[in-house]
A protein has these predicted regions:
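C-terminal effector-binding regulatory domain of bacterial HTH transcription factors
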Residues: 35, 161-162, 166, 176-226
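Hydrophobic hinge/microswitch elements
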Residues: 127-171, 178, 217
């Protein structure tokens, strides 16, 4: 039956900034289950899977808008302040969160990442308001802006890791991790779980931790800190 063999259309949705992260998993799943036709939609919002017909939605919002939805935790994500070596040569290296007040802190205009940068300091915290020298709603554009020396970008660790490893960016104020949150796969509850949905979620749970660990290992390597 359809619930035993993975086949048919698998409609996936994830935040725009996670598209590049997930593509190796999409390709790997496609190799395992070639009868499944994958439709991956990227956008800057959290859709309603029931209303919009998505089989699985990747989201950082674990709040279930509907009791007919199930959320499966996939791991934790975080963001880190980064800047290009050229920017730091010109403007100096912030040694403490308070030093960011004198820097061009670029703004993400995207609900998941919007707002102040909050650095916990014991019982207190340092709050930095990004300025309006540049804003974008896509993490990949923020990555390029940071690489080009436009200022300091607060980037998801998986977005920044390759540029950090290759020397195009330096991680600042390590080991601070900002915007730590859990990632979920959300899907409509059914009496039985369709094989393509079940196998995709199992594949995510199996593969994502190692993928996250690889990216985190790079950004947590003190050789790449400033």
């Amino acid at each position: 039956g359809a619930h035993l063999t993975p086949r048919g259309h698998l409609r996936l949705h994830c935040p725009h900034g996670m598209g590049l992260l997930l593509m190796p998993l999409v390709a790997g799943y496609n190799t395992l289950y070639p009868e499944v036709v994958i439709e991956l939609t990227l956008s800057q919002r959290n859709p309603d899977p029931l209303a919009e017909g998505h089989d699985v939605v990747i989201t950082v919002d674990g709040a279930l808008p509907d009791s007919q939805l199930i959320a499966v935790p996939l791991g934790n994500i975080f963001s880190i302040p980064c800047a290009a070596p050229g920017y730091l040569d010109t403007h100096g290296v912030p040694e403490r969160p308070e030093d960011l007040h004198g820097h061009r802190c670029l703004r993400m205009a995207y609900p998941m990442y919007e707002g102040d940068w909050v650095f916990p300091q014991g019982v207190d915290q340092c709050v930095i308001a990004p300025n309006d020298s540049f804003s974008t709603n896509v993490a990949d554009a923020m990555l390029v802006a940071s690489e080009l020396g436009m200022g300091i970008g607060l980037l998801p660790f998986y977005t920044a890791s390759e540029a950090i490893e290759q020397g195009r960016l330096r991680r600042l104020l390590a080991p601070y991790r900002l915007r730590e949150s859990a990632l979920y796969a959300m899907y409509p509850s059914r009496h039985y779980l369709d094989a393509k949905v079940r196998t995709w979620i199992d594949y995510l749970k199996e593969q994502l931790p190692a993928l996250f660990e690889g990216h985190a290992r790079v950004v947590d390597d003190a050789r790449y800190w400033r």
